[in-house]
Amino acid sequence: MFVKKGDKVRVIAGKDKGVEALVVTALPKVNKVVVEGVNIVKKHQKPNNENPQGAIVEKEAPIHVSNVQVLDKNGVAGRVGYKFVDGKKVRYNKKSGEVLD
């Protein structure tokens, strides 16, 4: 998967289109990512020791990886490619040519 935890990404589709934020979690088995402050859902929690009455908690839900683009250091969003630099495989922004790793 081309997105890693800690990458700065721009959401390119969905209700949060245009938002730029950091990836909190990458879920490669299901091709999804959790992005900070994006796709907030309300979860109804059952009563437990912490909340004896239960609660409605807002949390970030995963979005599909195809709905985000990785930003480079200059803030340019583009597709991610792979190339070898000094014998190491690195990710780079195909639009700007900037190395991401």
Curated annotation (Swiss-Prot):
Keyword RNA-binding attached: yes
One GO MF term attached to the UniProt entry: structural constituent of ribosome
Record-linked Pfam families: KOW (PF00467), ribosomal_L24 (PF17136)
A single BP term in Gene Ontology: translation
SS bond list: none
One GO cellular component term noted in the UniProt record for this chain: ribosome
Keyword RNA-binding in record: yes
Record keywords: Ribonucleoprotein, Ribosomal protein, RNA-binding, rRNA-binding
Entry superkingdom: Bacteria
PROSITE patterns, per database record: RIBOSOMAL_L24 (PS01108)
Cross-referenced InterPro entries: KOW, Rib_uL2_dom2, Ribosomal_uL24, Ribosomal_uL24_CS, Ribosomal_uL24_KOW, Translation_prot_SH3-like_sf
Family: Belongs to the universal ribosomal protein uL24 family.
Assembly notes: Part of the 50S ribosomal subunit.
Family matches, as HAMAP family: Ribosomal_uL24_B (MF_01326_B)
Described purpose of this protein according to its UniProt entry: One of two assembly initiator proteins, it binds directly to the 5'-end of the 23S rRNA, where it nucleates assembly of the 50S subunit.
Name the record gives this protein: Large ribosomal subunit protein uL24
Lineage summary: Bacteria, Bacillati, Bacillota, Bacilli, Lactobacillales
Gene name per UniProt: rplX
